[in-house]
A protein has these predicted regions:
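Residue-level recognition of tetratricopeptide repeat
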Residues: 29, 63, 97-98, 132, ...
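Structural marker of alpha-solenoid helical repeat scaffolds
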Residues: 16, 50, 84, 119, ...
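Terminal, low-structured helical/coil segments at or just beyond the last alpha-helical repeat
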Residues: 104, 163, 175-220
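Position-specific recognition of the canonical hydrophobic site in helix A of tetratricopeptide repeat
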Residues: 32, 59, 66, 100-101, ...
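Helix-start (N-cap) detector for alpha-helical repeat units in TPR-like alpha-solenoids
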Residues: 21-22, 55-56, 89-90, 124-125, ...
Length: 220
């Protein structure tokens, strides 16, 4: 209810001061909190039209576009954020991780992650992204090192455990891979705290666990 009241006030404020980029930005964030993504994108775009020198606006618009499935638009806005602020570690991480998810430009993805980690060397999510890039490059041992390091600096996270399972599986460590996926499944089905809303698909996790179990049985 407090968020809804705040949203109502911001709508009135924007109507009174339509040329305030800060008010449009605040309204976009309020819509984001209400999961009204289209309206959030609309007002973040208006904030940028009024002030195109704010790297944070480009980053937030990019994140909103990624959530909406507009990956091309998301990546373009991340690049613009980096143009304005070459040390924008979150934008570097975002771009690098998106390249890794798509499985292309992995060398460029690596460049972005190393830049992100230059400013935040103990950011567990950046280390996870770096590990995932190594995994996509077929360098599973390097990937394992980075994921294990990532887990030191983060709270238990289902996505990280899913990644850990995939990496261990690629190294034919089926027992530990199954354990990692079981942890991911538990955290997915019993969410606690703010995990950013990202969760693996439980059905896919269960299939992975079954596959690992079958391979373990075959090895006996």
């Amino acid at each position: 209810k407090k968020t809804q009241n705040w949203l109502t006030l911001l709508v009135k404020a924007v109507a009174m001061e339509p040329n305030s980029d800060q008010l449009h930005h605040s309204l976009a964030l309020a819509y984001m909190a209400q999961n009204e993504n289209d309206k959030a994108i609309e007002h973040m775009g208006k904030a940028l039209a009024l002030n195109s020198k704010k790297d944070s606006y480009y980053f937030e618009l990019g994140a909103l576009m990624e959530k909406a499935g507009d990956y091309k638009g998301a990546m373009e806005n991340m690049r613009l954020a980096i143009e304005l602020n070459p040390l924008h570690s979150n934008a570097h991480n975002f771009l690098g991780y998106m390249y890794a998810l798509e499985g292309h430009d992995l060398d460029q993805a690596l460049v972005h992650l190393k830049k992100a980690l230059t400013t935040q060397p103990r950011n567990g999510y950046f280390l996870d992204s770096l590990g995932w890039i190594y995994f996509k490059k077929g360098e599973s041992e390097k990937a394992l090192t980075q994921i294990q390091k990532a887990m030191i600096y983060t709270d238990p996270d289902p996505v990280l455990f899913d990644h850990l399972g995939d990496i261990l599986f690629s190294l034919k460590n089926y027992d530990e891979a199954s354990g990692a996926w079981k942890n991911s499944l538990f955290l997915t089905e019993n969410p606690k705290g703010n995990l950013g809303g990202e969760f693996p698909d439980p059905r896919i996790l269960k299939n992975k666990i079954d596959k690992a179990r079958n391979l373990m049985q075959q090895s006996y």
